[in-house]
Amino acid sequence: LRPDDLSDT
């Protein structure tokens, strides 16, 4: 999983 995939924002 890529950091962008988390969409924590």
Curated annotation (Swiss-Prot):
Chief place of localization: secreted
Source domain of life: Eukaryota
Function: The synthetic peptide has no antimicrobial activity against strains of Gram-positive or Gram-negative bacteria, or against yeasts and other fungi.
Protein name: U1-poneritoxin-Dq1c
Organism: Dinoponera quadriceps (South American ant)
CC per GO annotation: extracellular region
Keyword field: Secreted
Subcellular location: Secreted
Tissue-wise expression: Expressed by the venom gland.
